[in-house]
């Protein structure tokens, strides 16, 4: 199997010649101003780590540039939210840059583009405190704003897949920490816009992955995502305390993860031999199918790329 064949088969939950590997880091800010340099950085990361496919970063676009959000103070103002539109630089810029990355990676590389859920897009612009203030002040206003963002995200999803050539999206859903919302609040306030984008993405591609993000280090209320469907689920093995076989059974599909992404943990400190042994153990625990070896979330800048390559090479021997 070549890399594309291996990853495509893994997304279908079928047996591969070996377990695919994909871990990722963000692109440093000094590369953001030049799309060619940004693309080259991601292509070199693919080559240096020898992973089986690439999760494409959305760095530089972790915001939502709605003029209304710049000075938002009251929740009712969210009813004035307007779409950016398909020609807005925030949408077009991501599509055009992704074209360059996909072209540089070549036809053998499956690529998934990072897309944040609507509420996270708003939060990235205004911050957690204001997000929580507004949604508790008037949940319906925030739901409306999220629905507007969702329509723009559909334009982005279609563009990065059909125009830029990405195979699918890496859809990051967040904000389900056990101390943030009750299950009822999340399902009422957040789920509609989450699923609007997810369902649309699944209508465009059968190569999407859902990322149940635990970047904040707090356990997620996983029950609120039980009806979120995609061929692959990326989950937090350590924060959400769910091992590989348990995740396969819980999510009912191919699962992606395994290593703790946080600084100072095993992948950052272990010897090459220890990493090779742990790679083999995780693959064994997976049963050898319906598994992609990765990390809980984005790896930090201080992790040398050669450590990811150790995992890639070890997976081929396991």
Language model features by range: what are they?
Residues 16-80:
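N-terminal capping/small domains of soluble enzymes
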Residues 1-28, 33-35, 52-56, 85-318:
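Active-site loop segments of alpha/beta catalytic cores
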């Amino acid at each position: 199997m070549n890399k594309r064949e291996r990853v495509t088969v893994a997304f279908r939950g079928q047996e591969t010649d070996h377990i695919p590997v994909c871990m990722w880091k963000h692109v440093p800010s000094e590369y953001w101003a030049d799309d060619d340099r940004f693309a080259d950085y991601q292509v070199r990361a693919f080559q240096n780590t020898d992973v089986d496919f690439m999760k494409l970063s959305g760095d530089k676009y972790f915001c939502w540039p709605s003029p209304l959000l710049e000075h938002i103070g009251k929740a009712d103002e969210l009813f004035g939210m307007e779409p950016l539109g398909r020609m807005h630089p925030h949408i077009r810029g991501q599509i055009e840059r992704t074209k360059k990355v996909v072209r540089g990676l070549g036809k053998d590389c499956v690529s998934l583009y990072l897309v944040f859920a609507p509420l996270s897009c708003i939060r990235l612009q205004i911050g957690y405190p204001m997000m929580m203030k507004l949604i508790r002040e008037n949940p319906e206003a925030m739901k409306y704003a999220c629905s507007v963002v969702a329509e723009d995200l559909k334009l982005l999803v279609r563009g990065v897949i059909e125009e830029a050539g990405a195979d699918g999206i890496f859809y990051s859903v967040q904000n389900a920490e056990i101390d943030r919302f009750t299950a009822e609040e999340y399902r009422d306030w957040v789920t509609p816009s989450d699923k609007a984008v997810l369902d649309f993405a699944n209508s465009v591609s059968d190569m999407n992955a859902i990322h149940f993000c635990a970047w904040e280090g707090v356990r997620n209320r996983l029950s609120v995502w039980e009806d979120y469907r995609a061929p692959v689920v990326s989950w937090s093995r350590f924060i959400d305390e769910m091992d590989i076989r348990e995740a396969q059974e819980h999510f009912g599909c191919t699962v992606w993860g395994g290593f703790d992404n946080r600084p100072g943990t095993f992948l950052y400190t272990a010897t090459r031999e220890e990493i090779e042994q742990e790679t083999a153990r995780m693959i064994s625990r997976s049963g050898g199918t319906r598994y992609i070896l990765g990390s809980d979330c984005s790896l930090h800048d201080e992790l040398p790329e050669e450590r990811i390559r150790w995992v890639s090479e070890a997976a081929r021997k396991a």
